[in-house]
Design a protein with these regions (language model features):
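Long, charged interaction segments in nuclear RNA/chromatin-associated proteins
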Residues: 4, 17-20, 46, 54, ...
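A boundary/linker detector
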Residues: 1-52, 78
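Polybasic, low-complexity binding patches
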Residues: 100-108, 120-160, 164
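Short Cys/His-rich Zn2+-coordinating modules
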Residues: 41-64, 92-100
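Short cysteine-rich loop/turn motifs with clustered Cys
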Residues: 56-88
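Histidine-centered nuclease catalytic patch
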Residues: 78-109
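Zinc-coordinating Cys/His ligand positions in small cysteine/histidine-rich zinc-finger domains
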Residues: 110-117
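C-terminal, well-folded lobe of enzymatic/effector domains
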Residues: 128, 154-219
């Protein structure tokens, strides 16, 4: 079975949450010493990305926590010869719960991992680490992509436009004020993203207690 692409994951996330309140999100630097476990159901970094805001979990970790030169944090579970340990390949979603489960919208952690330790084959394994600087995430939802998580990060503007860019073929986001969000579609897109109307999009509104998908057009 072919795994879903990043475009398909974002589309599925939007479709599954139309009419529902989504959590606001946050990412805060913390220094955590305890054992951590891979989260079951978290999404890995896309294979091919451009390094800019919202594109992958690793770029969020590097930008927010300034971990450009980090290596994979895990010290107790030896990777086999020939693996990519100790490369910092992905931002790994972690929890203190041995079963790998996180309550919807609950707290999770993001730390540097190699792909070998980030594999689902390591689910349930306690990871020890001497490096402690990482991000504590709030509002993360199971199966969420970096695109939708980053779209709900704090902003002075009240709305977010998620759209499938016809040039790059990727989901991207742009923050909107209230006037832009209620404008006719043609003006909304030209003002917010300077391109003609994309084939797929969603408009999210921050209502204080979370975000609400107020409009969407999907394939």
């Amino acid at each position: 079975m072919v795994p879903p692409t990043e475009v398909e994951k974002v589309r599925a996330f939007i479709r599954a949450n139309i009419g529902k309140t989504l959590f606001s999100t946050g990412a805060k630097i913390v220094y955590f010493k305890g054992s951590l476990y891979n989260i079951t159901g978290s999404t890995h970094d896309p294979q091919q990305v451009r390094d800019y805001e919202g594109e992958n979990w690793k770029s969020l970790l590097v930008r927010k926590a300034e971990l450009d030169d980090a290596r994979c944090y895990v010290t107790n579970l030896s990777a086999p010869k020939g693996s990519n340990h100790d490369n910092f390949a992905v931002g790994g979603h972690m929890t203190t719960n041995p079963d790998g489960e996180v309550e919807k919208g609950g707290i999770s952690y993001l730390m540097p991992l190699c792909k070998w330790h980030n594999s689902t084959a390591r689910n349930g394994e306690a990871f020890e680490h001497t490096e402690t600087k990482m991000l504590r995430l709030t509002g993360f939802m199971e199966g969420e992509t970096p695109t939708t998580f980053m779209a709900r990060m704090p902003s002075e503007k009240s709305h977010v436009l998620l759209y499938l860019d016809p040039l790059s073929g990727r989901w991207e986001s742009s923050h909107l004020d209230a006037e832009q969000a209620i404008a006719p579609e043609a003006k909304l897109f030209s003002d917010a993203i300077k391109i003609t109307q994309p084939s797929e999009y969603a408009v999210l509104e921050n209502r204080g207690d979370g975000f609400f998908i107020k409009a969407a057009k999907l394939a």
